[in-house]
Curated annotation (Swiss-Prot):
It comes from Dechloromonas aromatica (strain RCB). One of its GO terms (molecular function) is metal ion binding. It comes from the Bacteria. Binds 1 [4Fe-4S] cluster per subunit. GO terms for biological process: dimethylallyl diphosphate biosynthetic process; isopentenyl diphosphate biosynthetic process, methylerythritol 4-phosphate pathway; terpenoid biosynthetic process. Dimethylallyl diphosphate binds at residues 41, 74, 124, 222-224, 266. Signal peptide: none annotated. Its EC number is 1.17.7.4. It catalyses: isopentenyl diphosphate + 2 oxidized [2Fe-2S]-[ferredoxin] + H2O = (2E)-4-hydroxy-3-methylbut-2-enyl diphosphate + 2 reduced [2Fe-2S]-[ferredoxin] + 2 H(+); dimethylallyl diphosphate + 2 oxidized [2Fe-2S]-[ferredoxin] + H2O = (2E)-4-hydroxy-3-methylbut-2-enyl diphosphate + 2 reduced [2Fe-2S]-[ferredoxin] + 2 H(+). The active site is at 126 (proton donor). This is 4-hydroxy-3-methylbut-2-enyl diphosphate reductase. The gene is ispH. The keyword DNA-binding does not apply. The keyword 4Fe-4S applies.
Amino acid sequence: MEIILANPRGFCAGVERAIAIVERALEKFGAPIYVRHEVVHNKFVCDDLRAKGAVFVEELDEVPAGSTVIFSAHGVSKAVREDAEARGLKVFDATCPLVTKVHVEVGKMRNQTREVVMIGHKGHPEVEGTMGQSQGGMYLVETADEVAQLQVSDPLHLSFVTQTTLSVDDATVVIDALKQRFPEIQGPKKDDICYATQNRQDAVKELAGKCDLVLVVGSPNSSNSRRLKEVAVGRNVMAFLIDDAEEIEESWLRGKQHIGVTAGASAPETLVERVVMHIQALTGASVTHLKGIEEGISFPLPKDLN
C-alpha cells in the first residue's frame, strides 16, 4: 500500500497570518483576547488557541467594553466594525487580504451604482461579511438554478464577485449562467477565488487520478476543505473529510492500494502527519510526495503587532 501526499496542502498565507495575529496579541496583551468567530475553521487550531487564552465569541455583545478583539480570517460586515468602534474595543483585523480585496471590489462597484451578485454559500461568515459591505443593492446566489430565478433592478448595471473558497469548477458554472442571463454583467478584474483554493483543488485533481481513496484533513465547517472532498468525489474517487486520524475507519482502507492525503487551507501539517502515521501503523504503507506549486506567499501582520 502507498500513501500519496498532495502538494500544496494545508495552511495558506491568510490562515498563517490569522493564527499569528491571535498568538502575537496574546503575547503582547495577555489573556483573554476575544476573537469574533473561529479565527479559522479548524477545531485543532481553535482548541490550541483557546488553551493559550483566546476566547471565541459569535457576537461583539459577548465582548466586555474596552477589551481587545480580533476579527476572524473570514472578514466582517461594516456594521460589525462600526459596533466595535462604538463600544471602544481595540480591534486587530485578521481578515485574509484576499477577502479584503473582494470587500474593496464591492465598494467600488456600489460606488459606480452597480448592483452586485455574490456567488457563495448562504450562512458562511465570509459571505455574511462581504454581503455586509453595502446596505442594499446586493444579491446572493449559490447555483445556476438560483441564477435562473434571480430578479435584479437593473440588468445593465450589474457586477459579480465570489466567495474566495468556492470550487473553481462549480463557480465557473454559475458565472457562465450569470453571463448568459445578464449579458452586460461585469466581473472583477482578477478572479476572486484565492490562489490557495485553486492550487489545492488542482492538486486534488492530480491526486485523484493516482488513488482509489482520498482523505481530506479538515474540519466539517471548513468551506475549502469540503470543496476538496467534492473535487475528489467528482473524479469518481471515494473520499472522506476527517478532523483527525482517529476518525479513519479501517474498512475504508481494505482493498485499497493508493491512498491520497491532502489538507484544507486551515488544517495544520501536524494533523496530516498523524494521519500518515495512523495509516502506516495499520498497513505499513510507504509514503510518496507529489510535486506541486511552491507558493512562497506571506502576508504582513498589523503594525501594532510587529
